[in-house]
Amino acid sequence: MKIHIIARGRIGRSPEGELVERYMKRLSWPYRITELPDRASNAPLPPAPPHSITVAMDEKGKTWRSMEFAQKIGNWQDEGRSEIRFLIGAADGLREEERAAADMYFAFGAATWPHMLARAMLAEQLWRASAILSGHPYHREG
């Protein structure tokens, strides 16, 4: 199973970019990050491979505790999903065609987060899910 983050805008060399890199390097799954031009561009999403799932990061999405997020990923892995795609929009959010491509929506709570920070938060949650599923002591709940 591959993790694929598809995001609008270039994160470049920034504190958020460093966090994304730090957490993604720790993942046990292979991963790919695709940066698309920002909202002004008509660049389409890369095609979804067969048996993949697409999760749009959106403030109106479902919120999952870290354990629930890990269980979702574990279930998708057990189902033999080829790729889990996470879509992160530009500063103004997701485009209509990006929303339409999503199988589900996930939110980091009710607050609105900057899109570059959302990437870092997603990278951390992916690492946390990997740690939970492997029994690593990184996650402490309670």
From Swiss-Prot:
Binding positions for S-adenosyl-L-methionine per the UniProt entry: 89
GO cellular component terms, semicolon-separated: cytoplasm
Keywords in alphabetical order: Cytoplasm, Methyltransferase, rRNA processing, S-adenosyl-L-methionine, Transferase
Family matches, as InterPro entries: Alpha/beta_knot_MTases, RlmH-like, tRNA_m1G_MTases_N
Keyword Methyltransferase found: yes
Molecular function via GO: rRNA (pseudouridine-N3-)-methyltransferase activity
Subcellular location: Cytoplasm
Entry EC no(s): 2.1.1.177
Domain of life: Bacteria
Keyword rRNA processing: yes
Pfam family, one: SPOUT_MTase
Function: Specifically methylates the pseudouridine at position 1915 (m3Psi1915) in 23S rRNA.
Protein name per UniProt: Ribosomal RNA large subunit methyltransferase H
Species: Zymomonas mobilis subsp. mobilis (strain ATCC 31821 / ZM4 / CP4)
Upper lineage: Bacteria, Pseudomonadati, Pseudomonadota, Alphaproteobacteria, Sphingomonadales
Gene name in the database record: rlmH
